[in-house]
């Protein structure tokens, strides 16, 4: 299942316009000080498709809010009110959000650890990811008006 999601994600991301991206765009790196918004912590800057930072932000916020698709629609509408997305960019965003990033991260952590057993904490994290999967897919289907 996760391999299929990853394959679809790669297809959607294939044609990307690349720019310098923050690389770790989340709520912790956006500050409001002296009446202005500031973006901080550029340690993970990378040259990548432009949609990477938007997708990272939407993913992080959505995970923290149980993949509430109404909030996802509001985030996307707000973003597009200042920076309209092409159909290609929307497909790229879909691809990034469809990619099973959390599952992949935990599996990679286990694989790289060279342990003969799966740590209890990793099993707990996998259980949480699997429990949220239906909400994540519903979020994607409703925000992008597709069926997976």
Residue ranges and their predicted role:
Residues 2, 37-39, 58:
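Gram-positive cell-envelope targeting signals
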Residues 10-52:
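Active-site acidic catalytic loop and adjacent metal/ATP-binding pocket
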């Amino acid at each position: 299942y996760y391999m299929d999601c990853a394959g679809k994600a790669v297809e959607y991301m294939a044609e990307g316009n690349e720019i310098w991206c923050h690389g770790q765009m989340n709520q912790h790196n956006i500050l409001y000080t002296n009446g202005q918004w500031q973006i901080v912590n550029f340690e993970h800057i990378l040259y990548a498709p432009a949609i990477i930072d938007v997708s990272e932000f939407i993913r992080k916020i959505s995970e923290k809010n149980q993949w509430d698709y109404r909030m996802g629609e509001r985030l996307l509408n707000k973003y597009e009110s200042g920076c309209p997305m092409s159909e290609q960019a929307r497909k790229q965003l879909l691809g990034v959000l469809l990619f099973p990033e959390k599952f992949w991260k935990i599996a990679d952590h286990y694989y790289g650890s060279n342990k003969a057993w799966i740590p209890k904490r990793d099993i707990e994290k996998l259980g949480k990811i699997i429990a949220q999967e239906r909400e994540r897919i519903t979020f994607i289907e409703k925000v992008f008006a597709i069926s997976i």
